């Protein structure tokens, strides 16, 4: 008889994001008291959790296969986990979802338009509230008095601080063409 063994790894960041001056806990803390409670629930319900994951994998594979063939479907199934992992989920002071991207391989910007934009199709397909959650921080920062430009911000800070902007507040950095950020915001904004 075969025996299956597994391992669960998790981390608890306690305070997840400093969102415009206020520390916010990760979204999962609204349901679970601590990381052990969350992991325990997932472990206890592992058969259901794995079945739901397999259903999602199958659904995504079939949709991608119909659109672009087997290689495209394989890439979509491979990349959607990376896309989700590149974001942090919290709520703001009004309880609205905030879904912030993290730049992992450059300077650590958070709420970065050019990281979030490529993931928008996935979230439009499965969870449109996350697209709104990507845009809320950008709209909030763009409405601040310190943002005096007529184009979209590149980001809303440096992880885990989402209360400023890495590039835009330094006028010396604003000599280039920043139409890319605005172009990246238009499609999800239209869907908003």
Predicted regions and their residues:
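Acidic/polar, glycine-enriched structural segments that form the non-catalytic walls/loops
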Residues: 1-111, 128, 132, 139-144
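Short, glycine-/Ser/Thr-/acidic-enriched flexible segments
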Residues: 12-14, 125, 190-192
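Short runs of predominantly hydrophobic/aromatic residues within well-ordered alpha helices
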Residues: 72, 76-77, 115, 182-185
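Solvent-exposed loop and edge beta-strand segments that line ligand/cofactor-binding
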Residues: 99-115, 166-181
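Second-shell loop/turn segments in exported
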Residues: 121
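Helix-terminus loop motifs that line ligand-binding clefts
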Residues: 130-192
């Amino acid at each position: 008889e075969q025996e299956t063994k597994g391992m669960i790894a998790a981390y608890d960041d306690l305070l997840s994001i400093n969102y415009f001056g206020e520390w916010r806990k990760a979204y999962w803390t609204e349901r679970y008291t601590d990381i052990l409670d969350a992991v325990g629930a997932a472990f206890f319900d592992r058969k259901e959790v794995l079945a739901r994951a397999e259903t999602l994998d199958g659904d995504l594979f079939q949709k991608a296969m119909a659109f672009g063939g087997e290689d495209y479907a394989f890439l979509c199934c491979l990349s959607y986990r990376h896309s989700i992992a590149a974001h942090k989920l919290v709520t703001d002071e009004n309880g609205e979802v905030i879904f912030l991207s993290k730049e992992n391989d450059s300077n650590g910007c958070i709420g970065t338009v050019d990281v979030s934009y490529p993931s928008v199709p996935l979230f439009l397909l499965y969870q449109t509230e996350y697209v709104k959650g990507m845009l809320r921080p950008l709209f909030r920062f763009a409405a601040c008095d310190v943002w005096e430009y007529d184009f979209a911000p590149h980001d809303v800070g440096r992880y885990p601080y989402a209360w400023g902007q890495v590039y835009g507040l330094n006028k010396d950095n604003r000599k280039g063409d920043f139409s890319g950020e605005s172009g990246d915001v238009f499609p999800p904004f239209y869907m908003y």
